[in-house]
Amino acid sequence: MLAIISSAKTLNFEKLAPKTELTIPMFLTLTNKLLSTLQSYSENQLSKIMNISAKLALINKERFKDFDNQESKAAIFTYAGDVFNNIHIEKLTNHALNFLQSHLLIISGLYGVLKPLDTIKPYRLEMATKLNEINLTNFWQDEVTNYINKILAKQENKYLLNLASQEYSSVINPNKLKYQLVNVHFKENRNGKLSRIGINAKKARGAMVKVIANNLIDSPELLKNFSYLGYAFSTKHSSDNELVFIKS
């Protein structure tokens, strides 16, 4: 089984990461192509296309301008936010971290896809951002889907577990994915209606990654006992391709 999660806008390069063997992102040639486009934008253009403040635009303009000389750090220890904070990566054993290295991918607008210990540099680029004529979803779709197919071909249980947002999981081409895609949904019962509460769903996704790592889980079936923040598996609302967890 291979799980996917979305990258995060928030990065933390200040927190120290444990010493471990780092890896290199798979698609650096394509990353550099995107960087060439990003480096051509003015601060004002970056502010508009990324919908960010002038201050953030200046920060990212400087990042892209001197990208090669920026510090780097393992992706799983760098991304912050609700999903990553609830993985509690700093508490994982080396064995659990090594398991994640071969069973988790992080989808990124700039890097396409990352293994947890792939090194990244400071950047901001959401998958929905349009760069001139480049649609990032289309730009990455074939490469990422083919890469996932190659990884799953070597896995014992050939499932792709989708813990990413719609914005990022859209980079997977279902028509070219050779193996079963299992989507995970976290919903809450509000006055008889099932709704997705974004912040709680993100926390639950991170907690599920932690459970996968700590228990070396390689099958969606083994996740049905997952419980966090009051979520519980719903047989009624689930199917072979959809795992639904409901909070009453």
Swiss-Prot record:
Family: Belongs to the UPF0246 family.
One Pfam family in the UniProt entry: H2O2_YaaD
Stored InterPro entries: YaaA
Stated name of the protein: UPF0246 protein RC0754
GO biological process terms, semicolon-separated: response to hydroperoxide
GO CC list: cytosol
Superkingdom, natural source: Bacteria
